[in-house]
Amino acid sequence: MTDKSNNPAPASDPSTTETSNDADGSDGQLDAETDPGTSTGPSDLDDVILDNLDAGSDDPSDEASRGLFDDLLEGEPIFENKEVLRPSYTPHKLPHREEQINNMATILVTALRGDTPSNILIYGKTGTGKTASAKFVSEELETTSQKYEVPCEVEYINCEVTDTQYRVLAQLANKFIDKNAQLIDDRIAELEELQSQARENTAALEETAFGSLDDVEAEIESLEADKSEFEEVPMTGWPTDRVYSSFFDAVDYHERVVVIMLDEIDKLVEKSGDDTLYNLSRMNSELENSRVSIMGISNDLKFTDFLDPRVKSSLGEEEIVFPPYDANQLRDILQARSDVAFKGDALTEDVIPLCAAFAAQEHGDARRALDLLRTAGELAERDQTDNVLEDHVRQAQEKIELDRVVEVVRTLPTQSKIVLFAIILLEKNGVHNINTGEVFNIYKNLCEEIDADILTQRRVTDLISELDMLGIVNAVVVSKGRYGRTKEISLSVPTEETEAVLLSDSRLGDIDDVQPFVQARFDN
C-alpha cells in the first residue's frame, strides 16, 4: 500500500519510498525538529528513530536520560504491516474460496439489475473464510453499483453483539436515517447552487424540471421537511413496532436494493427467536421503493431447525457451505499474508508450515493460523530477535490456548465455577480418579461458605458434562461392577492459571481457607 502524499522522501535518503502504514497501522509522523519542509513516510520512520538513537552524544549523562522505550526501539522491527494478520482485515484476494465467492456473486448480481436477490445462508466452522468472503463480495457489489449508477447498499450487523430484535432494527434504522440525511443534504446543496446560478441567469433552469425559482425553493423546503421527519432511534425505550416502523420508512425513502448481512445469525435466533428474521424476510411485500435481501452467516449448520417453517423457507432460498481449510491451503493463506505483514526474511522456513499444521488440527481454522503467526511475531519482537523461529510458534500456541482457557473460565456461570473449583481443590490435594460424589461433597461445602444455592447432584453431574464439552475437564464414564457406573474426572487445563481466574471472582475470592472443604471429602 503506498502513501497518497506527493511529497519527496527525506534528502538524506533519496532512494527511500513511502508506504502508508507502519507495523502497527499508525500514521507515524516526525516532529518539527526533523525537516519541516519534508514529509516523511512511515516506512522511513523506523530508520529515522534508529539513526537518532545511534547518533547520541558521548555524554555519560545520556545513559541516565534514556527512557523506558529507548532500548526496545533499538532492535530492527519485524513487522511491515501487522494489521493484515488481524481478523478485521479483508484481503483483496481470498485463496481457495473462489467457488464460494463466485456463487455469492452469481446470486447477488441481480441487485445490479434492480431486482431483489435471493436470500442467502452461509455455513461453515470458525475461521473458514465466511465473513471475509461475504465482505469482499459486498465491497465489490457496492463498487460496481456506483460504477453503473445503480443504487445498491450492503449493511453489516454482528449479531453476537447486536443480539436482540430491538437492537438490530434500531441499528439498521439509524444507518439508513444517516444515509438519507446525507442524501438530502447533498441534494439541497445542488439546488442551492442552481438557485444561485438562476438568480444571475434564469436560463440555468431550462434543462431542469423546475419552471421557476419558486419551484426550486419549494423542492428545498420539501426536502428539509423530509429530513425533519427522520428521528434517530434510541438503543432502548421505544416499542418494538415503532422501531420497525422507523426502519421501514428510512429504508423505503428512495429506490435502492439493500442486502442486510447478519453475521453470527444463530446468536440472534438463540437470544431473541426468529421474529427479526420473519419481519425482514416478509417486508418486501410492503415496500414501495426499495427491495431487501438477507445474507445470514452461521457457524451452526443446524440453527435453522429452530426456525418457524415459513421463516426457514424464505430465508434459506440459497445455501453456501464453506468447508474447513486443509494444511496446504492454510500454508498458502499464511504465505500470502506474511509477504505483506513481515519485513524481508523475518520468518524462518519452518514457521508457516508449523502454524498451518497447528491450525489444521483446529478444524482448519485460518483465523487461528493468522493469530498464531501474529503472536509468534510479537513474541520474537519482545525477544528482540531478527527472526521468527519455530520456538516462537510453539510459545504462541501455548499462549493462545491459555488465553482461550482464561476467557472460557472467566465467563462461566457461578455454579459452574464452583464445580470447577471443587475439582481443582481435589486435584491439588492429590486426589486421583475423582468421581462425581467427591466433587459434589466439596461443592456443597463451597456453596455453604459463599451462601450460594446448592444444586442437586444430578444437576452438578450435568455441569461437569458441560465443562467436559468445553474442554476444561475430562470426564470418562467407567464401570464399577456391582457398584454401577461413575464418572472419573480430571482437569484438562493448567491448574494454577485456572485457579487464579476463579479466585478473581469476588464470591470465590472470599473463601479464606479451602482445606476444610477438601477434608469434607473424607468426612462425608
UniProtKB/Swiss-Prot annotation:
| Gene Ontology BP terms | DNA replication
Domain of life of the source: Archaea
Q: Which UniProt keywords apply?
A: ATP-binding, DNA replication, Nucleotide-binding
Region annotation Disordered: residue ranges?
A: 1-67
InterPro entries named in the record: AAA+_ATPase, AAA_16, Cdc6_C, Cdc6_lid, ORC1/CDC6, Orc1/Cdc6_arc, P-loop_NTPase, WH-like_DNA-bd_sf
Positions annotated to bind ATP: 128-132, 325, 337
Q: Give start-end positions of Polar residues composition bias.
A: 1-23
Recorded GO MF terms: ATP binding; ATP hydrolysis activity
The family database entries (Pfam families) matched by this protein are listed as: AAA_16, Cdc6_C, Cdc6_lid
Q: Which PANTHER family match?
A: CELL DIVISION CONTROL PROTEIN 6-RELATED (PTHR10763), ORC1-TYPE DNA REPLICATION PROTEIN (PTHR10763:SF22)
Function in brief: Involved in regulation of DNA replication.
- HAMAP family under this entry? ORC1_type_DNA_replic_protein
Family of the protein in this entry: Belongs to the CDC6/cdc18 family.
Q: Mind telling me what this protein is named?
A: ORC1-type DNA replication protein 4
